Amino acid sequence: MSMTPREIVHELNRHIIGQDDAKRAVAIALRNRWRRMQLPAELRAEVTPKNILMIGPTGVGKTEIARRLAKLANAPFLKVEATKFTEVGYVGRDVESIIRDLADAAMKMLREQEIIRVRHRAEDAAEDRILDALLPQARVTSFSEEAAQTSSDSNTRQLFRKRLREGQLDDKEIEIEVADAVGVEIAAPPGMEEMTNQLQSLFANMGKGKRKARKLKVKEALKMVRDEEASRLVNDDDLKAKALEAVEQHGIVFIDEIDKVAKRGNVGGADVSREGVQRDLLPLIEGCTVNTKLGMVKTDHILFIASGAFHLSKPSDLVPELQGRLPIRVELKALTPEDFERILQEPHASLTEQYRELLKTEGLNIEFKADGIKRLAEIAYQVNEKTENIGARRLHTLLERLLEEVSFSAGDLASAHDEAPIQIDAAYVNGHLGELAQNEDLSRYIL
């Protein structure tokens, strides 16, 4: 990650409105990963990441920050829900599976990068194999045995290669030998994913090297052979070593819904298991060693970002040891009508742009006017205040309701309006949503 904190925040601003404190915190944490790697090895081992706790109501951008961060980081990244895990001894997934999943994500990411790197060599090798399958047929039907021995053989191959690249042979059927994939589906109860993965790897290795002849169209065969050649060019042992280092030095884990495993007051019963999940998370965040497919992974330098709405509980309800392991606290603010207005217009691929482009595919143009967007933002804010506050997610519900009739009759409306756009102004919004927004009982169930 060679981007500066300012550049990271600028990139996040393209997709997320407001929440500057949270953006700055994750930008600094991400940049510190790069800074640490520039230190001498001895000092580098001592510098541990400062984990982050993001606190804020639902729908204000916590999860969206995680999603965008994953694309920016170019590092092994995993987002998990804290509620999916149970204390060791209970039925369900244990928290160590987080690191196993992170290791799988690292392996997948590096394999994809490596396949892109060797793509050109794989394409050349795949073309040669397809031409080997094609040319015997061409020789029999088009050339005499004497001509096959001359230099015209090379010319023919080049001619066929040109036709292959231009797609002229895509529909021709050929018989070619490809790897025989052994796929075994194993159903196992929750919490036994590691055993399932090991069994699947075992069966996959048993079938490795087996090949069978298949009749395929050239287009399908080329794709299959290209993937096969790319996999052959990738060295799995090197990849595992790189993935192990990437997880340990650059891994990022985003734990959502951390508030749902916080103990609320002095409630007993099921909350015992919740506290158990927190205690199981402690060694993971503090630094321990977890057995994965890649080998033993040390979690000392993995960055953990936790987030929660904390509606029914407080950050102080987390066990004290876990609070201490999340030293950076960031509070995300509830959204205002002005924020809703900006969310509808400013982000890259904003909601209004998405609907506009979707309907354009049917030849129907819609235009969101400034007063219409303002009224929509006001209604979203009012409904959130009167009912449950679900933040920016309310806009999805409102826009679906607002454009339901237009979406249903898009084809007919496109013919009727020719190229004139449908104007979505304040009057249009009030006509479709005004009554629902005013009626609290209706808005509770419909909006």
Curated annotation (Swiss-Prot):
Subunit field text: A double ring-shaped homohexamer of HslV is capped on each side by a ring-shaped HslU homohexamer. The assembly of the HslU/HslV complex is dependent on binding of ATP.
Protein name, UniProt field: ATP-dependent protease ATPase subunit HslU
Family: Belongs to the ClpX chaperone family. HslU subfamily.
Disulfide-bonded cysteines: none
InterPro entries in UniProt: AAA+_ATPase, ATP-dep_Clp_protease_ClpX, ATPase_AAA_core, Clp_ATPase_C, HslU, P-loop_NTPase
PANTHER family to which the protein is assigned, alphabetical: ATP-DEPENDENT CLP PROTEASE ATP-BINDING SUBUNIT CLPX-LIKE, MITOCHONDRIAL-RELATED (PTHR48102), ATP-DEPENDENT PROTEASE ATPASE SUBUNIT HSLU (PTHR48102:SF3)
Signal peptide: none
Molecular function terms from GO: ATP binding; ATP hydrolysis activity; peptidase activity; proteasome-activating activity
Keywords: ATP-binding, Chaperone, Cytoplasm, Nucleotide-binding, Stress response
Highest taxon in the source lineage: Bacteria
GO cellular component: HslUV protease complex
Location in or out of the cell: Cytoplasm
Gene Ontology process terms (BP): protein unfolding; proteolysis involved in protein catabolic process
Purpose of the protein: ATPase subunit of a proteasome-like degradation complex; this subunit has chaperone activity. The binding of ATP and its subsequent hydrolysis by HslU are essential for unfolding of protein substrates subsequently hydrolyzed by HslV. HslU recognizes the N-terminal part of its protein substrates and unfolds these before they are guided to HslV for hydrolysis.
Binding of ATP, residues: I17, G59, V60, G61, K62, T63, E64, D256, E321, R393
